[in-house]
Amino acid sequence: MERDIDIWLVGNTGLRSPNRIQEGFRIYAESPFVGNFRGRDNEIGFMNLLNERGIIHNEAGKDASGSHARKWRLMFAKNGLIYPQLKKADGSQAELGALDAITPFGRTFLAADTYPAMQECFLRAMSVEQFPLAGGSYFSPLRWTLALMLELERR
């Protein structure tokens, strides 16, 4: 069975500016939500913290569900900054790392003190992202994009 690849999935977390990510992640790293990022109360708490610090602008009553926090959690996990929740079929959470705890790569990202250093972290995160395809192979959006660019340059 063939499945169309939705290339818009690349980095689609609902965050429109990567320049806010490090500041938002620093707020997470210094918060009581590290490793405690699940559940409505914690999601709303982190969302409110982001709002108080000016990272997001949640108009009063606009988002009462904590969806902003879930977008940030997804982005942190997709970029390897925190340990994602594993499905049992994918292995042991304990072997990977504590759920929503900051990864060594997350610490590297926090330590990035220049714009090029942050860009290198983003590039590293994009270089390992892969999506499973039918037949057991994988699709890498970055590698596909680079291959396409090289082919266009060759022509």
Sequence positions of predicted segments:
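Donor-sugar nucleotide-binding helix/loop cap in glycosyltransferases
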Residues: 1-155
